[in-house]
Amino acid sequence: GSVVSHEYGPRNNLPAYICIPNMPNEFAGSGYLSSSYAPFSLGADPANQDFRVQDLNLPNGVDEARFARRRDALSSVNEYFSTRHNADSVTAMDSFYERAYSLISSEKARVAFDIEQEDAAMRDRYGRHEAGQRLLLARRLVEAGARFVTLTYGGWDMHTYITNGFRAS
């Protein structure tokens, strides 16, 4: 996922690499690439009734106007340092923040992550359990433009008592 993110970048204001519900282990991270190519983790499970993507909305107490003022202030500080110092880290963080701003301000991204927008019958067809809702959200994100989506769903890799294990799940 990180290689895809590095080579192709984001599309339609969506992160290039997304992990549902979270990054499962260090092998799903950015490896030797910059952390800016690491996956975007939802921070919540789409199978939960109160599912909400962790960092998709503005924090409580921050409206659009306050958000814009903060962004302008950060831009001024970054401009000051980048013109007076050799600040590669400022440039790198600036691109990271730009992607975050694009995600937060994109209605299309919010719709893609909002599994409640999906038809109830379709949600039922996928199954209202971890596997079904994670797969459904992955499909929505790919259709909206995410380049690489991975999801975690454990408990199916059985080595003993396979028949009974599958019946139980």
Residue ranges: model-predicted function:
Residues 1-169:
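Ligand-binding pockets and gating/stacking loops
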